[in-house]
Amino acid sequence: MAIVVVGAGTAGVNAAFWLRQYGYKGEIRIFSRESVAPYQRPPLSKAFLTSEIAESAVPLKPEGFYTNNNITISLNTPIVSIDVGRKIVSSKDGKEYAYEKLILATPASARRLTCEGSELSGVCYLRSMEDAKNLRRKLVESASVVVLGGGVIGLEVASAAVGLGKRVTVIEATPRVMARVVTPAAANLVRARLEAEGIEFKLNAKLTSIKGRNGHVEQCVLESGEEIQADLIVVGIGAIPELELATEAALEVSNGVVVDDQMCTSDTSIYAIGDCAMARNPFWGTMVRLETIHNAVTHAQIVASSICGTSTPAPTPPRFWSDLKGMALQGLGALKDYDKLVVAINNETLELEVLAYKQERLIATETINLPKRQGALAGSIKLPD
């Protein structure tokens, strides 16, 4: 039996790893649209941009992993169609590959600007190694950097840029940074720290157009009429799941490929995991699409156990982390529908602990610069009754 994996990110590669761990002996083939071996994505918005680490320092798996585990990986080979009747995928170069089981692990794509000037040189996105190398080059050449979007990735890029001595402005459409992922207490502490480092924030601000000169960006124009100087604009306004293959294969989609608890789609031979999958998360208590390393690894283990017929691993709370100018931010659990927050903050040491409760049950935690405490709290978050 041949298993084909479309996508060579954390989800896809770890699915192949767990298939071997669970004893699968058949052929495994991973297809990647990129020309480089699978790599870790988190460093791309941090140390990689400041040249503290090189491309060779971020492999997803050690050298020899694919050969030692008899996993075939085809680089620079995008899959463009699925024939569900014949159980065949076709690559861009016209070749066909048969599968018994197909795992869709396609990464999300950056949401792109559509305003006037969005196609000018100097407007950059960050999702891939190629994007990161391009952005790293442009950071060297730029003095004024505007980051559109105050989410985790945007703030990581802003932190890297200010660390390189650039003048940095973050434009965020909502009243606070990281509004979708952290509490106001964490957001305010992070913003205060980054402002102290020299980053300027424009909150409740909407970009209306980009002005340029000789084909290159020069200014961002806000709805208020304010104009902000920019040699480089980094866009971090969210990501969109890649659903073209699933849609053409007539799979059920809804802001992601809809899957059951075993990561199986509406076609029993096709699975979806990671960024592209809309799956029920027991801690969120609903169908949700999450773009985190923890989610990708969890999905990979579940799909492998399902295919191999082994017991499904026990669920663990969702988690994320970031590193922002000396602030180790960690989140655990599903931060929604809480009825009580317990906040402990030390502005001098930049330490924060937030405990979120629902009906006296701990459902989520946030910490800044308290890694041991976060680890101790992990076991306290239980599945809803």
Swiss-Prot record:
<dbReference type="GO" id="GO:0016651">
    <property type="term" value="F:oxidoreductase activity, acting on NAD(P)H"/>
</dbReference>
<feature type="binding site">
    <location>
        <begin position="8"/>
        <end position="11"/>
    </location>
    <ligand>
        <name>FAD</name>
    </ligand>
</feature>
<feature type="binding site">
    <location>
        <position position="293"/>
    </location>
    <ligand>
        <name>FAD</name>
    </ligand>
</feature>
<keyword id="KW-0274">FAD</keyword>
<keyword id="KW-0963">Cytoplasm</keyword>
<keyword id="KW-0520">NAD</keyword>
<dbReference type="Pfam" id="PF14759">
    <property type="entry name" value="Reductase_C"/>
</dbReference>
<dbReference type="InterPro" id="IPR023753">
    <property type="entry name" value="FAD/NAD-binding_dom"/>
</dbReference>
<dbReference type="GO" id="GO:0050660">
    <property type="term" value="F:flavin adenine dinucleotide binding"/>
</dbReference>
<feature type="binding site">
    <location>
        <position position="79"/>
    </location>
    <ligand>
        <name>FAD</name>
    </ligand>
</feature>
<dbReference type="GO" id="GO:0015044">
    <property type="term" value="F:rubredoxin-NAD+ reductase activity"/>
</dbReference>
<keyword id="KW-0560">Oxidoreductase</keyword>
<keyword id="KW-0285">Flavoprotein</keyword>
<protein>
    <recommendedName>
        <fullName>Rubredoxin-NAD(+) reductase</fullName>
        <ecNumber>1.18.1.1</ecNumber>
    </recommendedName>
</protein>
<comment type="pathway">
    <text>Hydrocarbon metabolism; alkane degradation.</text>
</comment>
<dbReference type="InterPro" id="IPR050446">
    <property type="entry name" value="FAD-oxidoreductase/Apoptosis"/>
</dbReference>
<dbReference type="Pfam" id="PF07992">
    <property type="entry name" value="Pyr_redox_2"/>
</dbReference>
<dbReference type="GO" id="GO:0043448">
    <property type="term" value="P:alkane catabolic process"/>
</dbReference>
<dbReference type="GO" id="GO:0015046">
    <property type="term" value="F:rubredoxin-NADP+ reductase activity"/>
</dbReference>
<dbReference type="InterPro" id="IPR016156">
    <property type="entry name" value="FAD/NAD-linked_Rdtase_dimer_sf"/>
</dbReference>
<dbReference type="InterPro" id="IPR028202">
    <property type="entry name" value="Reductase_C"/>
</dbReference>
<comment type="subunit">
    <text>Homodimer.</text>
</comment>
<dbReference type="InterPro" id="IPR036188">
    <property type="entry name" value="FAD/NAD-bd_sf"/>
</dbReference>
<comment type="function">
    <text>Involved in the hydrocarbon hydroxylating system, which transfers electrons from NADH to rubredoxin reductase and then through rubredoxin to alkane 1 monooxygenase.</text>
</comment>
<comment type="similarity">
    <text>Belongs to the FAD-dependent oxidoreductase family.</text>
</comment>
<keyword id="KW-0614">Plasmid</keyword>
<feature type="binding site">
    <location>
        <position position="275"/>
    </location>
    <ligand>
        <name>FAD</name>
    </ligand>
</feature>
<dbReference type="GO" id="GO:0005737">
    <property type="term" value="C:cytoplasm"/>
</dbReference>
<feature type="binding site">
    <location>
        <begin position="32"/>
        <end position="33"/>
    </location>
    <ligand>
        <name>FAD</name>
    </ligand>
</feature>
<feature type="binding site">
    <location>
        <position position="156"/>
    </location>
    <ligand>
        <name>FAD</name>
    </ligand>
</feature>
